[in-house]
Amino acid sequence: MVRVAIAGAAGRMGRNLIKAVNGSQFAVLAAASERPESSLIGVDVGEMAGLGKSGILIVDDLAKVTDDFDVIIDFTLPISTLKNIELCQEHNKAIVIGTTGFSEPGKEIIDQASKEIPVVMAPNYSVGVNLVFKLLEKAAKVMGDYCDIEIVEAHHRYKVDAPSGTAIGMGEAIAGAMGNKLEDVAVYAREGITGERSKDEIGFATIRAGDIVGEHTAMFADIGERVEITHKATDRMTFANGAVRASHWLHKKEPGFYTMHDVLNLDQI
């Protein structure tokens, strides 16, 4: 049984993570944190999440309760996640990272930390999305050189980064399968007279509207036919359950940088 700490416990994902841990037979909720200025500091996390009294009080810094947990699950903001990574290094804890929008220096910090502690990082913890990543690799190897490739993603109005980490992950899977780096072929915006589309680019389009949980489509368009691979999420519990699954898998692993491909053993497919 892995003892889990939830960073950003009062957020949309934080509350779902609490529910996912509560419903898991492999994990137990051991700690929860919120930003220092939150009015929920000192509140019982179970009561906050509508699950009844848990005996776990929300703290403003997980450093205060490091003896209580084995793994942090962090779906917050890059600046907060990087602080928790430092905490994990200091106290030999594992971390599951669902935060997106890291800068290149931030990614380098995570990579260096993974040499000391076990880290799972994924743009999306849905089992279905990670299967899609694998399907995209296969599709790109068969069709990529002959098609125009576009990725369209849609999320709720409150999402603060674009394109989504999942969309970027899709682009990386496709580009990598074709022997390219995404940064060399990605086109994130088109406006005005753009000229003819180049053959090797991967285009991205972003929608932010309403309460869309998450929808992603990768399009392989040739003359006369088009293949689309789509994933639609209707409940954030999909992501939360996957992250809890990852925390159980990560517990007692050797230091290293892992992804959901490792958690789900997708490389064997």
Swiss-Prot record:
Extent of the signal sequence: none
Record function comment: Catalyzes the conversion of 4-hydroxy-tetrahydrodipicolinate (HTPA) to tetrahydrodipicolinate.
Binding residues for NADP(+): R35
PANTHER family xref list: 4-HYDROXY-TETRAHYDRODIPICOLINATE REDUCTASE 1, CHLOROPLASTIC-RELATED, DIHYDRODIPICOLINATE REDUCTASE
Keywords assigned by UniProt, alphabetized: Amino-acid biosynthesis, Cytoplasm, Diaminopimelate biosynthesis, Lysine biosynthesis, NAD, NADP, Oxidoreductase
Gene name tied to this protein: dapB
PROSITE patterns attached to this UniProt entry: DAPB
GO terms for biological process, alphabetical: diaminopimelate biosynthetic process; lysine biosynthetic process via diaminopimelate
A GO term from the CC aspect: cytosol
Residues at which NAD(+) binds: G8, A9, A10, G11, R12, M13, E34, G98, T99, T100, A122, P123, N124, Y125
UniProt-recorded name of the protein: 4-hydroxy-tetrahydrodipicolinate reductase
Residues annotated as the enzyme's active site: H155, K159
Enzyme class: oxidoreductase
Record-listed (S)-2,3,4,5-tetrahydrodipicolinate binding positions: H156, G165, T166
